[in-house]
Amino acid sequence: MAQLYFYYSAMNAGKTTALLQSSYNYQERGMRTVLYTADMNSRDNRYKQIKSRIGLYASARVFNIKTNFFDQVVTIHQKDIIHCVLVDECHFLNRNQVIDLSKIVDVLNIPVLCYGLRTDFRADLFSGSLWLLAWADKLIELKTICYCGRKANRVLRIDDQGLIIRDGNQILVGGNNRYVSVCRKHFVEQLESPLSLTKRVYKNR
């Protein structure tokens, strides 16, 4: 039986690499996959390249807040059988889209693998993550580490000087270099510290 999977982590845990590897595993066995990634400023049915930090890449359909995953996958599936749907940056999904993905699993019997962040720089859940935590059949945490060596499960947003940013929009387009993954302990300490992240890391060594 197909299932809906949610692979979540802090930043730089290899989510995109894991997605591309999973897609490759299907394709290596002659099975067809459909990949999606977020682009909130594009129209449906356009394509975008998914690229991992280690250089792996693949073409993917883009989704925005208007994308109907179920209708799209039904149309594609009728022309050529789909064996797996994989969604990158799934934290940008909304409630209806998560339900769409569950229908792909339950009605079409196609597994859906979603990869994304669980929480933002304030440790608040993203919309997509909230609904996937409620609707997914399987929850899998992908692990990365804090500068102290503990498991990182939070992200901090920083400015050019390494100072912690505590307020602002939840989504910062193209701002991956503005985030640092840390453990819960150092997430709280950083929010309470006047030091820049760089000075704080040096002090803790």
From Swiss-Prot:
Family label: Belongs to the thymidine kinase family.
Question: What is the catalytic activity of this protein?
Answer: thymidine + ATP = dTMP + ADP + H(+)
**Lineage of the organism:** Bacteria, Pseudomonadati, Pseudomonadota, Gammaproteobacteria, Enterobacterales
Secretion signal: which residues?
none
For the biological process aspect of GO, one term held by this record is: DNA biosynthetic process
Q: Which GO terms describe its cellular component?
A: cytosol
Question: What's the Enzyme Commission number for this chain?
Answer: 2.7.1.21
Q: Which NCBIfam families match?
A: PRK04296.1-5
Q: Which annotated residues bind Zn(2+)?
A: 146, 148, 183, 186
Listed InterPro entries: P-loop_NTPase, Thymidine_kinase
- Protein name per the record: Thymidine kinase
Query: Could you give the subunit structure recorded for this chain?
Result: Homotetramer.
- Positions that bind ATP: 9-16, 88-91
Keywords from the named record:
ATP-binding, Cytoplasm, DNA synthesis, Kinase, Metal-binding, Nucleotide-binding, Transferase, Zinc
Q: Where is the active site?
A: 89 (proton acceptor)
Q: Where in the cell is it found?
A: Cytoplasm
- UniProt key word Chaperone: no
Q: What class of enzyme is it?
A: transferase
Q: Name one GO molecular function term.
A: ATP binding
